[in-house]
């Protein structure tokens, strides 16, 4: 007999637990569900339909609950479960029927998720405008809708001793790197944690980002990005209750690629990629180069420009480094405030704040006009990179280079540049070099091809390059 008393004890700390008793002769049938996660409409439809038909023979004993339900409601789908699994099924929105030593679970999960909306962090003008939401099945369905092939394999795991979160590993079996797949599965299966509430929990536990400032795993909320990555032989991770999926492995060049590039002309894509590369150098190196020149290497500037800069800074009471940090810190406040403020007001407040604060700071003699220009151009250049993780890397090295430039001048900037390149070339994303699509293993015949294309590697060539 299944112990019903423990469910009555559960009601002491789970007031949304509902238990109903129905008598059949000398025996009782128990209907148990959790009202907050199960649909009362579905529960009534399934259970009451069964009870209404059973009431005609109410005094007849039930010899086998499973067979009895199949006989009276042949169209209904259910699963026979063990006593030890009842609690887990209840928390997942199932309604459980218990009769003597039998337990039958009906899926009556309430719809607690939002619909498929436009992506919020990766806005797009051309191409699909759907995005993942917190519904696990919906997210997998959005990928299946795009990849109608038997080679799409899904390995499902359950992570988190407390949360029991379903996690899926998606890959195309005919093109995936088997070593990469085995390493990914091993790392995910080895996760020991009480809670997995989002894919970011998985990301922090399986990546090497604690040892490196560069994001080696990319997250996205766009199904078309996931589908494209799968066709390149990559692996994707989708988690229950998360609107972001992970892409493994991720390379440096991937952060210069935008999903809208798929729907643009080839010549335009090449031009925009050049702009993005220039923007990366500007947003990381421009403040440091200015500080190096204005502090130590004034001879680099033309005399007239140096005199102009000196006159602008004559009324500024702070060293150039402190002046730069005042403006950078103000920009960071505006950036974070814009991210946390509702979109209808955030942009207006940021523009208004930047204009008023910049003008007031120059008039008050706190900062020089050239420093305002430097910080403004740096901030605008960082907008080209929409991925928050990559922007964190940009911030880290921007401030580090500013310190080096303030103490060592241009030499410090060069040391910082060498360190960044060395660090980038030493990073691996799940055994694959982070810079592999820029400096791949090539035979003699393909070197000429790489020189011609440079960073303009076509999407169709990426897969073969990083697998070599």
Whereabouts are the PLM-identified features?
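Membrane-embedded alpha-helical signal segments
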Residues: 1-285, 299-303, 424-468
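Amphipathic alpha-helical protein-protein interaction surfaces
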Residues: 148, 314, 366, 409-410
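Active-site proximal loops enriched in glycine and acidic residues that flank catalytic Cys/His/Asp
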Residues: 239-241, 320, 343, 408
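Transmembrane alpha-helical segments that form the functional core of multipass membrane systems
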Residues: 251-399
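Hydrophobic alpha-helical transmembrane segments of membrane transport and translocation systems
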Residues: 369-371, 375-468
């Amino acid at each position: 007999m299944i112990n019903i008393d423990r469910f009555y004890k559960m009601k002491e700390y789970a007031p949304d637990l509902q238990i109903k008793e129905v008598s059949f002769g000398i025996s009782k049938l128990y209907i148990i569900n959790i009202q907050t996660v199960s649909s009362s409409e579905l529960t009534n439809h399934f259970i009451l339909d069964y009870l209404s038909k059973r009431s005609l023979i109410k005094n007849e004993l039930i010899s086998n609950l499973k067979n009895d339900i199949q006989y009276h409601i042949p169209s209904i789908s259910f699963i026979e479960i063990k006593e030890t699994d009842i609690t887990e099924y209840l928390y997942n929105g199932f309604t459980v029927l218990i009769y003597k030593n039998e337990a039958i679970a009906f899926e009556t999960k309430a719809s607690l998720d939002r619909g498929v909306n436009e992506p919020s962090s990766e806005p797009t003008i051309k191409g699909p405008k759907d995005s993942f939401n917190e519904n696990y099945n919906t997210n997998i369905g959005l990928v299946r809708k795009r990849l109608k092939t038997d080679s799409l394999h899904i390995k499902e795991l359950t992570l988190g001793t407390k949360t029991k979160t379903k996690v899926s590993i998606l890959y195309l079996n005919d093109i995936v790197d088997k070593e990469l797949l085995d390493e990914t599965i091993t790392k995910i299966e080895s996760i020991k944690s009480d809670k997995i509430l989002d894919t970011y929990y998985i990301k922090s536990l399986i990546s090497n980002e604690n040892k490196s400032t560069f994001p080696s795993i990319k997250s996205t909320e766009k199904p078309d990005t996931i589908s494209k990555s799968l066709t390149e032989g990559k692996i994707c991770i989708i988690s229950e209750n998360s609107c972001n999926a992970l892409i493994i492995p991720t390379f440096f060049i991937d952060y210069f690629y935008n999903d809208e590039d798929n729907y643009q002309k080839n010549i335009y894509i090449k031009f925009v990629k050049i702009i993005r590369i220039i923007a990366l150098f500007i947003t990381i190196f421009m403040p440091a180069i200015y500080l190096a020149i204005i502090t130590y290497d004034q001879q680099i500037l033309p005399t007239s420009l140096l005199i102009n800069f000196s006159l602008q800074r004559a009324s500024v009471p702070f060293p150039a480094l402190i002046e730069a940090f005042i403006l950078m810190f103000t920009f960071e406040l505006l950036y974070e405030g814009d991210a946390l403020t509702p979109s209808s007001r955030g942009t207006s407040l940021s523009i208004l704040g930047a204009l008023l604060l910049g003008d007031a700071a120059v008039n008050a003699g706190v900062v020089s006009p050239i420093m305002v220009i430097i910080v403004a151009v740096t901030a605008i250049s960082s907008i080209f990179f929409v991925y928050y993780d990559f922007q964190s890397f940009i911030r880290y090295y921007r401030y580090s280079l500013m310190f080096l430039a303030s103490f060592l001048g241009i030499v410090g900037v060069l040391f910082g540049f060498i360190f960044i390149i060395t660090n980038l070339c030493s990073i691996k994303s799940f055994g694959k070099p982070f810079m592999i699509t820029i400096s791949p293993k090539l035979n003699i015949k393909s070197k000429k091809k790489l020189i011609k294309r440079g960073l303009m590697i076509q999407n169709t060539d990426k897969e073969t390059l990083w697998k070599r």
